Amino acid sequence: FKQKTAYEISLGLVGSEMCIRDRVITYIKALPGCAKIETKTSLNLSQPFNRMKVRLKKEIVTMGQPNIDPSKKVGRYIDPKNWDEFTKKDDVVVIDTRNKYEIEIGTFKGSINPDTDSFKKFPGWWEKNKDKFHGKKIAMFCTGGIRCEKSSNYLLNQGVKDVFHLKGGILNYLEKTKKVDSNWEGECYVFDHRVSVNHDLNKGSYECCFACGRPLSLTDRSDSKFEFGVSCAKCIDEFSEDRKARFRERQKQILLAEKRGKDHLG
């Protein structure tokens, strides 16, 4: 179980057997103000979370803009069934609001990559590039919809009139769109042990580098600079030998825990 709570929104992820999951959702929806809470489901063969984790944050996803308040106004929602048709219009610009390492493994055809390594850099990117999009309708998307709630509020506050975003994010689109009809290319990065999911929302082909957190393809993991649990070709020069030694010790403890049939929680 993983829970993040801020004044703007609460985000919860539950990994459980289906019968328990249904009971959890029923319980949450019975709480005051939670009857219409939005849920998404995907299947996995193993537990995606090692432990229960609850965090109180100023922002669920840090944007660093003091006047952002998605509870007051957001862009207009586009349902997954209408997304592809809408985004193919000549007067629509499609922007992926996620980080570049997420976009590298999958995105919508023809979408713009802001090439940012954190969400708080999105406002700066917009300020530098907004003149290119003058007079256009702006359609944005992200993994589950939270970053779009905030980025659409930001653009509306900047005076942009026609702001839209994908309802429920990429995961909702993949759930409700047949692959043969889809405008999605690649896999979708997710923030749990699955690392990525494919179009069927099953665990994808990517694994995560423990050191830098970047998603690694099979080719990346076959690189001579890749050391499992320690570093990859993308980050091998980013960490000192002391830190790499600590990563190796951690990996050793993980393997020992696995031999004992236990999960390593560190």
Across the structure, where does each feature detected by a protein language model lie?
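Internal catalytic-core helix/loop-beta-alpha segment
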Residues: I68, K73-V92
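Short, small-residue-biased leader/transition segments that mark boundaries at the very start
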Residues: Q3-I20
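Generic structural signal for beta-strand residues in well-ordered domains
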Residues: L11, E85-T87, D131, N202
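A generic local structural motif
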Residues: K4-Y7, P80-N82, G124-K128
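Rhodanese-like catalytic fold shared by cysteine-dependent sulfurtransferases
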Residues: S16-V74, N99-I138, I146-G266
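Structural scaffold elements adjacent to functional motifs in cytosolic proteins
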Residues: I95-D96
